[in-house]
Amino acid sequence: MKQYHDLMQHILDQGVKKEDRTGTGTVSVFGYQMRFNLQEGFPLLTTKKLHMRSITHELLWFLQGDTNIKYLKDNNVSIWDEWADENGNLGPVYGYQWRSWPTPDGKHIDQITNVVNMIKNNPDSRRLIVSAWNVGEIEKMKLPPCHAFFQFYVADGKLSCQLYQRSADVFLGVPFNIASYALLTMMVAQVCGLQAGDFVHTLGDAHLYSNHLEQAKLQLSRDFRPLPAMKINPDVKSIFDFKFEDFTLEGYDPHPHIKAAVAV
């Protein structure tokens, strides 16, 4: 995916050195955007192998409103282990905000249900938005949302999605985020009777950790391979009815995985 390689090269060429919360240090740029046409293949990196199973399970976990890692652990997904407490809880993170945003009068807002209904009934709305950035609950979260806010857009029978990501771990996190939101866009499009359009990824602080620079250069040296296709069970009509078995990745032939440490 040239868009992603261009981002990494831009950071290596133009980035500034910054300190960060984890103490690792980064090379960073501010404000960057990528666009992926979902009709041209599923945007899963081919220049290193990614674990699509983890991405899919995490997205299904978000959509169920879950904030305990038990479901992930039961499915051999460990990407949230470093942040969970001794009981597996993460506080009111993504799934809670997506499905149960608390209101001052003690009620809760299911943003996912609301946005799907709005897409179906008022597709030209400019309010097709879901936010995970709840200022009043940031301190309760084990990790504040990195991918904080997304908006849908309907035109010509296609559903597009733009994500704003405040903090972007470009080597490890961003490839997961691209695939996750591309899949979410396809799922929402299906249940709304639309085709998938574009996924637009807007980054705030886009950074390579200082211990990922050599891995990034190795990845940049690799040739692109054809993008895979993601097949979704067409019988699923509700965004909350999807199961892991409803997704089939076809034609994925990536270069080998590149190991890199997670900054916690």
Swiss-Prot record:
It is found in: Cytoplasm. Homodimer. DUMP binds at R21, R126, R127, R166, S167, A168, D169, N177, H207, L208, Y209. Catalyzes the reductive methylation of 2'-deoxyuridine-5'-monophosphate (dUMP) to 2'-deoxythymidine-5'-monophosphate (dTMP) while utilizing 5,10-methylenetetrahydrofolate (mTHF) as the methyl donor and reductant in the reaction, yielding dihydrofolate (DHF) as a by-product. This enzymatic reaction provides an intracellular de novo source of dTMP, an essential precursor for DNA biosynthesis. The active site is at C146 (nucleophile). PANTHER family: THYMIDYLATE SYNTHASE, THYMIDYLATE SYNTHASE 1. It is an enzyme of class 2 (transferase). (6R)-5,10-methylene-5,6,7,8-tetrahydrofolate binds at H51, D169, A263. This is Thymidylate synthase. PROSITE patterns: THYMIDYLATE_SYNTHASE. It comes from the Bacteria. It comes from Cytophaga hutchinsonii (strain ATCC 33406 / DSM 1761 / CIP 103989 / NBRC 15051 / NCIMB 9469 / D465). It holds the Pfam family Thymidylat_synt. One of its GO terms (molecular function) is thymidylate synthase activity. One of its GO terms (biological process) is dTMP biosynthetic process. SUPFAM superfamilies: Thymidylate synthase/dCMP hydroxymethylase. Its main location: cytoplasm. GO terms for cellular component: cytosol. Keywords: Cytoplasm, Methyltransferase, Nucleotide biosynthesis, Transferase. Pathway: Pyrimidine metabolism; dTTP biosynthesis. Belongs to the thymidylate synthase family. Bacterial-type ThyA subfamily. Its EC number is 2.1.1.45.
